[in-house]
Amino acid sequence: MTATAFDAKFSARHLPTTRWLFFFIYAGIGVNLTFLNVFYISQGLTGTQVGLIGLAAASSAMLAAGFWGYLSDRTGQARLIMAGGAIAASLLALLYPLVHTFWLFLLLSVLFAFFTTSAFILIDATTLALLGDRRDEYGRYRLGGSIGYILAAASAGFVFERIGLRWMFPAYAVIMVMFALTALRLPALPIHAGGQHSRQLGAMIRQPSWIIFALCIFLVWTAMNGSINFLGITIKSMGGGDSLIGIAATMAAVAELPFMFFSGSMMRRMGMRNMLWTSMLFFTLRIGLYGFMPHPAWAIGINLLNGPSYVFMWNSAVNYANHMAPENLKATAQGLFQATTNLASMVGAVLCGWMFDQIGSANMFRVLAVSCFAAFLIFGLTRRRFQPA
């Protein structure tokens, strides 16, 4: 396809497919990634080893992010790339129950992250392309992911408590096969004319607005990575069970629903920059509270802040990256944005694994809250001076 926008009727026909794609990929997170670090600990790995696995996976995802985005921009075949990545990830997931050593877990995590990254990047780029000028309505389609996560995480904790965590892997494989089949229903994306991709890319990432954006995302996502990777382990260490982990994760997703649904109107009212800035303050509050909770059940209430923290950040950041990119580098920009989050995950995996072992989970969360507040200050001081081009 060449550089023409999708017409309204064409977009209306295909946008519901993206909602199902979000549903399946986040249902996969609900049954797998929510409990993956708990599974590692149950296999005898230490917090530092879990952190190193997270580092390796994030390194792989960071390298893959730009590759998948650039490949999609050049070929327009996001649907085939997503489907192929999902099938590969489902096959790799089935190998996890057969592995028992740290080094094999490390290798699997690298391969798994490489292929799953394609879906996370390209589903966003595809949805934004289909929305066209209505990109602020992205949240209404991403809402499918919140629903998928709620249904999966709410049931998975109770089920795994009875049948064992090993069953998360075949469950994930089935979900990702459904994702792959759904992805094949999408159209090819437009291939926008324009050479000199490298020069355009260099100009984009040298913008002061992009540099500040990437720095603040890095600081917040380093902290977010700690809460993702170690909240479940913290709940366990405080006496909670798999069901409580599932309930806490479910409440975070439930809190997303109204924010996802109304994110378009809220973004129009607040603006991308103010929404992104506000999210950093809520992340400071949310992650700081993890560091002071006296009982694991407090995680349920704290996770209600997921709406104004995670939803505000993700939806505004996806649009912010898209806004700064030229037409022929939209998927590449999403890849670079997610490469930044993966770089943060690399640092966060090692840093949080070390802090968990050395200073405990409470102090770890407090340090991470400071990182979020630093991002809030930096972005607040510069958001008006350095605006996206």
PLM region spans:
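Juxtamembrane intracellular "pre-TM" segments in multi-pass secondary transporters
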Residues: 2-12, 186-217
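Helix-loop boundary and gating motifs at the non-cytosolic
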Residues: 8-58, 210-217, 221-248
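Hydrophobic core of transmembrane alpha-helices in multi-pass small-molecule transporters
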Residues: 23, 92, 102-120, 218, ...
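Interfacial helix-cap and linker-helix signal at transmembrane-aqueous boundaries
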Residues: 40-41, 71-72, 143, 158-163, ...
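Loop-to-transmembrane helix entry/capping segments in MFS-fold secondary transporters
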Residues: 47-48, 132-144, 242-243, 327-337
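Structural signature of the two symmetry-related core transmembrane helices
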Residues: 80-94, 173, 274-289
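Cytoplasmic helix-loop-helix junction between adjacent transmembrane helices
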Residues: 110-144
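Symmetry-related core transmembrane helices of the 12-TM Major Facilitator Superfamily/SLC fold
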Residues: 167-184, 365-381
